[in-house]
Amino acid sequence: MVKTVEQILANANDSVTLINEINDGDFSYFREGYTQEIINRRVQENVAHLERVLAMAPADDDDPTPDVAGSEIDKSSYTTAVATGKQYLTDNG
């Protein structure tokens, strides 16, 4: 079963939430003693995941990949999370 753009974006919400929580100083996702290096790696992984999701598009007319990149659905929360994550990495790298 091919997922819809809406389903793909809904599945990416966890990455948005994690990036925003870390940026806001909420580290409850992590066990005590996690280093800044580990936190940064998680932020980077989630930024990369969101970038892959936002770039999703079919390669040709026969490709069933949903066209997230070309969709007119509001993706601002995802693009904002990417920018927030990148800034966090700059500030805490």
Residue ranges and their predicted role:
Residues 16, 47, 54, 75, ...:
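Heptad-repeat amphipathic alpha-helical coiled-coil interaction surface used
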Residues 21-36, 57-75:
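Charged, low-complexity interaction regions
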Residues 1-25, 90-93:
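Short, intrinsically disordered N-terminal pre-domain segments
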